[in-house]
Amino acid sequence: MIDAFIEVLKTFPIGLVYVGMGILLLAFARLVQDFVTPYKIQEQLRTHDNVALALSIAGYYLGIIIVFVGAVYQPFTSSVDSNLGFTTEYWGDVIEVLVTTVIGIIILNVARIIVDKLVLYKFSTEKEIVEDHNAGTGAVEAAVYVSVGIV
C-alpha cells in the first residue's frame, strides 16, 4: 500500500505540469475567442443572460478539453530519474501537447467562421445568438465545436 502511494508521489509533479498547462490553455482560448468575436462575451453572459451564447461557449470549452485530452493521452512511460521524471523526452511531450492544443484552438475558431459562412449562410449565427438569443443556434455551434474537437 505504501509502495503504491510512493509511486504516485513520484509521478505527481509530472501530472501537475499538465494540469497547470491545461488551465493556462483554457485561459488562452478565452482570450482568443474574445479577440475573434465582434461582441463582448462577458457582457452577453452577465447582463443579458444569453443562454444561446452560454451553450456555444460550453461547446467551445468542451471542444478544447477534448483536443487537450486527446493530445495528452498517449502511452505513459514511467521513466523516473533524479529530476522527478522531468526528462528531455517528457518536455518534448509537453511541447507537443502545447502545440497541438494551440493549433486546435485556432482550428475551432476557424470552424466557427466556416460554419457561419458556408453551412448556415442563410442567416447570421451572430445575430441569432447575440440579438435573438436563439438557443438552437447556440446548440448547433456547440455541436460544431465538439465535433471539430473530436476530429
Where do the protein language model's features map onto the residues?
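Membrane-helix interface motif
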Residues: 32-36, 68-83, 114, 118
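Mid-bilayer segments of alpha-helical transmembrane spans in multi-pass integral membrane proteins
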Residues: 97, 101-114, 140, 147-148
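A generic, lipid-embedded transmembrane alpha helix
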Residues: 51-75, 143-148
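Membrane-interface segments at loop-to-transmembrane junctions
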Residues: 42-56, 125-141
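Membrane-interface helix-loop junction between the first two transmembrane segments
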Residues: 27-47
